[in-house]
């Protein structure tokens, strides 16, 4: 599909691709569309390693994949947005908000990423919460700026996030807005 909702979006859902094949496809797409700005991968643990050594251990495979995604982003001068699964450790904690250590199969994802943003919805764990319909975007790593939390409205029927009035505040280096409490904390 070349156009989706008026946007020049190319989808490639070829299953079981190696990271080498993904990078080759990205290079080809960049050659065809020099204005290519973003590559998305859903999700990193589904990609396959290219090297025989990395194919033997999943942690090594994810490390190779995350490293190669970082390299292709630099080579092609594009942003790479990559989804990743979490392990189940956060399910065992009283505070279910995900942390960097919860990234599944590899600390290399955390190491290679410029930014790591994790989502949390309290109503998933606590159906009676006052935060029904609220999603927290937890900026756990941000090489280019501050870390923090952004709360948005979550509309499951439309699979859409939208801005909360509390987030209309000054923007910080990472490009996110902060609630009044977070603004005060970041200003300190």
Residue ranges of predicted features:
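Conserved P-loop NTPase mechanochemical-coupling segment
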Residues: 1-17
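Conserved beta-strand segments of the P-loop GTPase G domain that flank and frequently precede/overlap
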Residues: 12-13, 82-84, 119-120
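A generic structural signal for short
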Residues: 14, 57-58, 94-95
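Conserved phosphate-coordination/catalytic loops
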Residues: 13-20, 60-63, 100
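Helical hairpin unit composed of two closely spaced alpha helices linked by a short loop
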Residues: 36-82
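Active-site-proximal loop/turn and secondary-structure-junction residues that shape catalytic pockets
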Residues: 15-16, 45, 86-88
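C-terminal regions of RecA-like/P-loop NTPase motor modules
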Residues: 3, 19-36, 53, 67-76, ...
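Residue-level signature of catalytic and energy-coupling elements of molecular machines
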Residues: 11, 42, 81, 114, ...
């Amino acid at each position: 599909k070349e156009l989706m909702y008026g946007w020049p979006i190319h989808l490639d859902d070829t299953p079981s691709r190696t990271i080498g094949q993904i990078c080759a496809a990205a290079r080809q797409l960049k050659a065809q569309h020099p204005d290519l700005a973003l590559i998305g991968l859903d999700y990193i643990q589904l990609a396959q390693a290219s090297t025989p050594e990395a194919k033997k251990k999943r942690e090594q495979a994810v490390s190779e994949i995350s490293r190669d995604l970082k390299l292709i982003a630099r080579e092609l001068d594009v942003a790479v947005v990559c989804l990743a699964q979490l392990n189940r450790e956060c399910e065992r904690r009283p505070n279910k908000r995900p942390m960097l250590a919860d990234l599944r199969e590899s600390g290399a994802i955390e190491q290679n990423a410029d930014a790591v943003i994790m989502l949390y919805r309290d109503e998933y764990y606590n159906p009676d919460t006052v935060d029904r319909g609220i999603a927290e975007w937890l900026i756990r790593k941000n090489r280019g700026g501050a870390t923090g939390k952004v709360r948005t409205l979550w509309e499951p029927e439309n699979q859409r996030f939208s801005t909360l009035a509390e987030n209309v505040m000054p923007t910080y280096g990472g490009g996110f807005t902060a609630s009044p409490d977070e603004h005060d904390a970041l200003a300190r």
